[in-house]
Amino acid sequence: MKFTVEQKDPLSKARAGALTTDHGVIKTPIFMPVGTVASVKGVHQRELRDDIDPDVILGNTYHLYLRPGTGILEEAGGLHKFMGWERNILTDSGGYQVYSLSNNRKIKEEGVKFKSHIDGSQHVFTPENVMEIQRTIGADIIMAFDECTPYPCDYNYAKRSMHLTHRWLDRCVAHLDKLPFKYGYSQSFFPIVQGSTFKDLRKQSAEYIASVEAEGNAIGGLSVGEPAEEMYEMAELVCDILPEDKPRYLMGVGTPINILKNIALGVDMFDCVMPTRNARNGMLFTAHGTINIKNKKWENDFSPIDEMGITFVDTEYSKAYLRHLFVANEYLGKQIATIHNLGFYLWLVRTARERILAGDFLDWKIKMVQQMDKRL
């Protein structure tokens, strides 16, 4: 993997870059649609490729391990071939999903014992087998196995958890060195900064992660319930420590406003279920604010869903029609809304990149944040 910073914004810490893997170039800043179980909910791969057009999508190690399982994925020749996606894929390590199973998991030095949310069967994740699972899944970018702390979090617990994450990281690195690539292309490895919302822990973790000299670095344990200002404070602190010549990935973030503000702090990569999940509930993101398409005010609005939108659904269908689909509980409504929201997120990060390259990102960001904060 090769990463190049092409341009830095003169008035913020934003940067435009390019990350090159064996499956192509990822232009940053980038938003990665979440394809948890080898599909982005409600979207065909053809629509994803031709209309939404992301350079990279995200898959989930926990879910793919449980279903379809590594045996099927290996037989298929890896996740790319299994799902018919020729561009880049990043897999998370399953740490966050295990964290979210708080009542059905036990964390020890060796790893995490957990019960499947599907059938209650018992499983164990260790740094070693998570590296093996991710080798078999075959994503272009794979993540270290970490523990994600909840919010709020006791300082002593956050400290113990951070040190555990660091010890697990050492085991990930040692084991990964023994595992050859499986499908004729290389994989890049990102460790994860933890430390909850404690400045000294975040600093310590960022310094430790930077010392590993991996191909990229991730920031985890944010967007788990903390106030947005705390998230920004932690992200800025960590970005200032992580090396400039490596991509920085803020995991699980966020709203369009969150994304723009974190780009200004030096973050390059984002993922979040928000555009797809909110779409299925009738919430549309636009450059002028958010729309609850189920509201009666859209019943007679025959204007396009979004005249500025980049996907075919934005101009082919009206707000009134989309509202009708939601009121009638037609699944097509959720699909249209999902394509719109993902298209908007990709438009947002692409335009941010253009503005960084043009040197006027900050003014544009301030204006966009004000506009997007409105309810239409």
Positions of predicted regions on the chain:
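C-terminal extensions of enzymes
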Residues: 1-18, 26-32, 41-42, 146-153, ...
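Non-catalytic, usually N-terminal nucleic-acid engagement modules in DNA/RNA processing proteins
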Residues: 1-182, 296-299
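Conserved, mostly hydrophobic/aromatic
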Residues: 24, 57, 92, 134, ...
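C-terminal helical cap(s) of enzyme catalytic domains, especially alpha/beta-barrels
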Residues: 70-76, 279-293, 346-349, 358
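A non-catalytic, amphipathic alpha-helix used as a structural packing/dimerization or gating element
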Residues: 129, 133-137, 160, 164-171, ...
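Glycine- and acidic
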Residues: 151-155, 159, 216-223, 331-334
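Glycine-rich phosphate/ribose-binding loops and adjacent secondary-structure elements
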Residues: 175, 179, 187-305
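Surface-exposed helix-capping loop/turn segments at secondary-structure junctions
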Residues: 175-183, 246, 352-364
